[in-house]
């Protein structure tokens, strides 16, 4: 597993000012996001947890997975959650030519339309940003759970979420994927409870 920032350093949004790194509302809130789904069983479990706590979230969906599991995608939408484009084939922008990357984004737009996009791995070139910024709102994050990291425990995943005090308008990332499942399903309800107990609400981006 390569090096990654659990919390976004202050200078990174300065390099990519056209991207969304946090929410922008007055109340004490957190934006909860999930990447890489939908998955026929894992996403369903996530929806059950969110329903239990009456929380809404963003799901950044891989177009190919939406084609495979359309009913699961429909269930996300039916439950009042927001969906976003996560490319059709989960492309790494740093390893993909801009023309191919944009075409992959557009292929997902043919499957479902969304106002929001998150680049897989958070890796996108300046050229790709320039090509896409008029087509979508690009959403990054302020805090990673690290649930995708095979080298950490589920307890460490939870610690990543709550060790440093939460700040209003933060965007946090989990994954509704097989690789992340064990850590995500352990940490998610505990993180939600922690946030609610500390006076935060969960909001959707506008």
Go through each PLM region and give its residues.
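CE4/NodB-like, metal-dependent polysaccharide N-deacetylase domain
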Residues: 47-56, 60-61, 81-82, 88-91, ...
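Catalytic grooves of carbohydrate-active enzymes
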Residues: 162-206
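Acidic-and-aromatic substrate-binding clefts and catalytic sites of carbohydrate-active enzymes
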Residues: 37-41, 60-69, 91-99, 118-125, ...
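N-terminal pre-catalytic segment of deacetylase/amide-hydrolase enzymes
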Residues: 1-32, 38-52, 68-71, 189-206
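His/Asp/Glu-enriched short active-site or ligand-binding loop at hydrolase and phosphoryl-transfer sites
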Residues: 123, 129-165, 199-206
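Glycine-enriched alpha-helix->loop->beta-strand junction motifs that scaffold or abut catalytic
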Residues: 53-55, 78-83, 133-142
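Charged helix-capping and loop-helix junction motifs
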Residues: 71-74, 98-105, 153-159, 185-189
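Active-site groove signature of glycoside hydrolases
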Residues: 29-36, 171-177
